Amino acid sequence: MRILTVLLALMAGATVAKAETLQTAIFAGGCFWCVESDFDKVEGVVETVSGYTGGTLQNATYRNHGEHREAVRITFDADIVSYDQLLYVFWRTVDPTDAGGQFCDRGHSYLTGIFALNEAQATAARASKDALRGRLGAPIVTEIFPASDFWDAETYHQNYHQKNANRYNYYRTGCGRDARVAQLWGDEAPFANNH
């Protein structure tokens, strides 16, 4: 019985330690299906959830999301991947020079954005944005905001790239996302044409 108690205590300690290394990031990068798909490929990402953030409407939905942007809440293991590494991936999977949306998706809900959950994330996001100035031949228009309420998208949007792979790939290719990302970032584009 004593050994069982010790083992349970050790396992509980490991669970608490693991929980402390789990962190959250929120990125808006146009269509949340694509953002979710890209970050699901990153080692150390534990979960991605598509949703809406940045607006004021309560209980946002796809049909009624007000001034929210499509975004993805990312849970990651900071022992495996850092927030700075996620920022690197984010920038290189979007067109941060597009002030009208992303790729074929136009309008406010498809604008890019970084939603910082604390001052450390805000500082890292600003530094990563500053490091890109002058690299792409146009101003970086992606905004950095303090995180606000995040409303999970409807169930059919979650893991869309897995549940509806053919439709998703047709959409992604037709929208020109990978072609534009490859044009902007070249060899630095981690997932262009990798779907």
Regions found by a protein language model. Name each.
Residues K18-H195:
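Flexible coil/turn and secondary-structure edge motifs
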